[in-house]
Regions:
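Selective transmembrane helix interface/packing segments
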Residues: 1-271
Length: 271
């Protein structure tokens, strides 16, 4: 008999050359392909010199909205041109993965997999044999799972964001950027530098677990509600998860933008 199966880690659904392909990897791959197709079409529409179509107007509105959002924080044309594509990539990849997990069939179409549960054999309260009693059980494994509901995906996004922060810092401040981490001018500055290193590492954990925790918790909530009370009752929670998916994508993108900007300015310019 199949039972409700909730796994923190993504489940492998195939193996290629010894590498496990998980349901979250497959979902992220589908989302990436769809985003590439969308932005290729968007780029082609922007080259149109005739009367703009509705799609072109939508693309121009989206791009201009992100440019204005970035400009409101960085106030530099060079940084706007540099940061806007990255922030858009973060936002659309995250929100597409968040919302992809809410589509019909995602998380609900899969296969039943038999598992074995080991139960220690006992008799009259005394262990008779150090053996096991095999009880077959079926657990449901979905073919697709939201990429951002997998800690590996959110951790990768967090590492990319923090690495880009360091790259932009070095690009704008040259070697002077590292004085925020290594500063022997005074004991206090040396201690502050150590704290800065810890904070940079903490950003990775904060980014990764905030996004993963919110999206995974939403998936668990929807799975439990649908399993216990199907049809009408889970619908308001889908609306909530649409909102949460948008907010989490926006928070990740805006925090990345703020950290990018802070890394490109000297300590004296931050205040």
């Amino acid at each position: 008999m199949a039972s409700l199966h909730i796994s923190i880690s993504a489940e492998p659904i195939a193996t290629i050359a010894g590498l496990h392909i998980t349901n979250s990897i497959l979902a992220s791959l589908i989302v990436t392909i769809l985003l590439i197709l969308f932005f290729v079409a968007a780029g082609a529409s922007l080259k149109n010199t005739g009367k703009p179509s509705r799609f072109q107007s939508l693309v121009e509105f989206i791009v201009e909205t992100f440019r204005n959002m970035v400009r409101s924080i960085v106030e530099s044309d060079r940084k706007v041109a540099l940061f806007t594509p990255i922030i858009m990539a973060f936002f659309f990849f995250i929100i597409a993965n968040n919302w992809f997990g809410l589509l019909p069939g995602v998380g609900s179409i899969g296969f039943n997999e038999p598992v074995e549960r080991a139960v220690e054999a006992t008799a009259e309260g005394t262990i008779v044999e150090a053996g096991t009693l095999i009880q077959p059980e079926q657990v449901f494994i979905p073919y697709l799972r939201a990429g951002t509901a997998d800690l590996n995906t959110t951790l990768a996004l967090a590492i990319i964001s923090v690495l880009l922060t360091q790259i932009y810092g070095v690009s704008f401040q040259k070697l002077g950027y590292f004085t925020k981490f290594i500063n022997f001018s005074s004991p206090i500055n040396f201690f502050v530098g150590l704290l800065e290193m810890i904070l940079e590492a903490a950003k990775i954990m904060s980014f990764a677990f905030r996004l993963f925790g919110n999206i995974f918790a939403g998936e668990v909530l929807l799975a439990v509600m649908t399993f216990l009370i199907p049809l009408v009752v889970p619908m308001p929670f889908y609306g909530l998860e649409i909102f949460v998916g948008f907010i989490q994508a926006l928070v990740f993108s805006m925090l990345s933008l703020v950290f990018f900007n802070m890394a490109t300015i000297g300590h004296g310019e931050e205040h």
